[in-house]
């Protein structure tokens, strides 16, 4: 058996089982109502969330590397699922549940393949600011989408703003009983979260809603209920898709869903691995996510991924291994076998309240404000509008979700982050350095430390970026501008801060050296990085290395009248 199979359970101790059992029971109390709620976000019957949770909890530990991660339906991927499937078949179509399960299979297939190909680094392409903006936008869309159920009114179609306007326009038709149940359950969950965080508020709200439905006969009073749910487990099988031509559409949407789910789950797994001193294998996490989704799809479920909130509950309750996850799976099976008749009378407003309570804390306006405040006047001077790249990316993803739906919003954020990264690296800061008085050879940016002193006739510069084709011209223009000013006899380039160089940039350095030589200005370099040295030599720009010095002080000293270039020849060659 491969070493990675059940790797998260290796070293299991018998003394752990009590903690794992208690943690599993605690997570079950949170997972049941949230899975019901997230299934409604995905546009399918609430019980589909339970169908998906069971194989996810059973299969992830077989491959995954986290001892604590809880895998199941989540709000972000549920919203993405609704968007992807809704773009293929109508929300009212009888095929919607099958396509939802088909999307889980597509996500699982892609994730397993990506894990086998060791593509775990893909999560790095969704930056934290993009994910922040996406999640805030998604949470707002979910909340507005649940308001009609919460208040017992007709909802609207379209983007976030069209749905919001439909809610506002229908406020005169609010159902009193629906609003009372929905708002009451919402208030209950939020109050319990603040005053009694150990109490599973969502489960309490669901139980209260079921009790009120029975005692007050809410269905006869016009309150919508979940309705009949078949008891037991569905038979495993491949979803019946009506058209094979829809499979490419599912696969294309599955790529974005997989990335979001993987990024969210990987972050949760790493958080608790750091706390307990073990390592997470990103490729195994991808494959584990894939196995969980394949199982969910084959059991008529929906897309699943790792949950930070439920993982926190799991770890906080003392879980030591994935035995806690298997405990949750067993309890969920028991729930489907015995308790499903109770969920039939669950009021839709109570379920909407659980959904809203679950996502309302994701509307992190303070986090967006912190991204905005990261910018400084100095950064604005250097990068212009691109100085607020993180905030712009988050805002782009947020607005993209609100105007164009979830997956397009995510893509907008990713594209913006790449464009702004290129914009910043295409015009890197070329700092002019000055000597710090009494600093024992310390050189700093004169713009940031006015007390530093430039050397007369010598310009010392530091390029704060790697050099490549996109910024070669900008750096060349800046170097020549500084080196050809009146009275300059030498340009010292601190190359220790240049981590990489490509062929285009190497040619640029060769051209700069030649032009400065023709003008009688010496070009000297300080320090180097091995890969930079190799590229310069292999591209014919090795002459720059013949003027290489170990320190800025040594290079500046070599520019003094009477000092020859030979003073630096080979001084820093390695």
Model features per residue range: what roles?
Residues 433-574:
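Structured cytosolic domains appended to multi-pass membrane proteins
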Residues 1-440, 447, 455, 471, ...:
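Transmembrane helical cores of multi-pass ion-transport proteins
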